[in-house]
Each structure stands twice: as structure tokens, then as C-alpha cells.
Amino acid sequence: MPIKETDKEVVLTHPADETTSVHILKYGATVYSWKLKSEEQLWLSTAAKLDGSKPVRGGIPLVFPVFGKNSTDEHLSKLPQHGLARNSTWEFLGQTKENPPTVQFGLKPEIANPELTKLWPMDYLLILTVELGSDYLKTAIEVENTSSSKELKFNWLFHTYFRIEDIEGTMVSNLAGMKLYDQLLKESYVDKHPVVTFNQETDVIYQNVSAERAIQIVDKGVQIHTLKRYNLPDTVVWNPWIEKSQGMADFEPKTGYQQMICIEPGHVHDFISLAPGKKWNAYQLLCKEELKYQAIQ
């Protein structure tokens, strides 16, 4: 069976290859495993909570309606870090396509985390579509403002944890020449390095990255992950390194930072403002492609 549903999760298996699969937790609609020909592509902490007691550390958590902590908006500032989507149990809406196997999940205030909904009393409908190709994974989001009178202001981000061999031998390409905001230094500047490399904690937001740029994770000169995006102009690059890993109870093993890198496409540098009745769509596509260096434009 290409689609299997349990109380806690939905599992998709590709009809042409049963070793290619994706596991989606209903809590947070979080993809926590994606295997291509038996090989895991995503990083998941061995201490990640998959029981709905807290957001999942690893996989692809969904960030909505706020990225990080907000200090200026009357309602968004009351929400915890990264909002309420990853802290809510989504409704499984069913299968929309047999091949490639495609399913949808929905979230609206009536079923979202009630404590957080009280803090952010807005009207919305989220539809997440997960499509498992034979050689790719696509996660798409549609946000609808279901209010008849109020504007909907929000961020969106796919907090994707990629699995890698060794962070110190890993590079991220095709972000050269982009303006970024360094969340550790609290500074903005243009990244003039040809590739992103890692030897310490990294937490930066690249802004206005053209959708034509395929962001690639490279290990010793070989492409291991390619990320394509639609309508997601910002890209967060994050690795907690040694000290921050030690301080996160659900981050295990503590050396796990060596085997993961977060490349997170989103719309977070500023807010999306959606008029009543309007919809906003975006997606990320995770795949494998030949190494292609896109120079500074």
C-alpha cells in the first residue's frame, strides 16, 4: 500500500520502489523521515519527541505564523518561538494522487493548539501537501485568510534538517553575493564567500534569494542535497555547533551537530500580509542534481 495511516502518522511508500518512503507525524504535520532507496535524507535527534508532547527536533518542522520570537506585534509577540503550527495536531485530509503518492493535511483555529489559539485569535486555513517522487520530496503550503474583515500577517518557513556525513567537510553553494542577516552578530552584510563553510555556530538569514538559485549541499566536492523553492525568498542556514547542542535537552547525540545542517526556505525577513479571503502559496522541493555552481549575479 502506497499510503498507510495510523493514529499518530501517515506513511507514504513509492509504488515503484518500496525503499523510498516518507513518514509524516500528524502532530505538527512534521515530516520526520524521508528515505531514498533505503537511505535516510533527513536528520532526526535520537531524543526527538514523536508523541505530541513538544515540537519535533529534526525532520521538517513547520514554522507559522511567526519565525523566532516577535517583540513588536500585539498578538504574535505572545506566541512561543516559531508559532503554533508545529505545536498543533493537524487533520489528515487524505490522498490526492496515487502516483506520485500525494497527501494533504489541514490546520485551522478550531483544531489548533487551544492555548496558543487564545494568544493569536486569527482566522486562517493551512493546507500542507506532501508529494513523494521516486527521486524527490515536495512539501507545499497554502495559507488562506478566512476572515471577512481582518488582514492576516504571518511568516512561513520549512525548518528542514538535512542529514550529512560531516559538517566540517560540508559546503553550501549558490548563496554567494546574497545579503544576509547574522542572528549571532546582529549585523547585515553581503556574503562574498564563494561557498558557505562551517567551523562554528552558524545562524544566518539570506534575503531575497532568487528562486532560480538551486541551493546545494556539497560533501567533498559531491552534491548530496539540492533545494529548490517557490515563493520563499529567504533562506536560513543554521548549525548549533558544540555549546548550543549541549543546552538543548532534545538534541541527541550531543555530537549530532556534525551530521546535520538546517537549510530553511521561508518568508521571514518581513511579514506576508494577506487580505481577507485571499490565499498565499509556496513550496520546497528536495532532490538530487548534478553540482551546478551559480555565480554572483
UniProtKB/Swiss-Prot annotation:
Positions contributing to substrate binding: R57, Q81, R86, D203
GO MF annotation list: carbohydrate binding; glucose-6-phosphate 1-epimerase activity
Organism superkingdom: Eukaryota
Active site feature: H159, E264
GO biological process: one example: carbohydrate metabolic process
Catalytic activity, reaction form: alpha-D-glucose 6-phosphate = beta-D-glucose 6-phosphate
Pfam families to which the protein is assigned, alphabetical: Aldose_epim
Classification via InterPro entries: Aldose_1/G6P_1-epimerase, G6P_1-epimerase, Gal_mutarotase_sf_dom, GH-type_carb-bd
Residue list for modification Phosphoserine: S88
GO CC terms of this entry: cytoplasm; nucleus
Extra remark: Present with 8580 molecules/cell in log phase SD medium.
Protein name per Swiss-Prot or TrEMBL: Glucose-6-phosphate 1-epimerase
Protein's organism: Saccharomyces cerevisiae (strain ATCC 204508 / S288c) (Baker's yeast)
Lineage: Eukaryota, Fungi, Dikarya, Ascomycota, Saccharomycotina
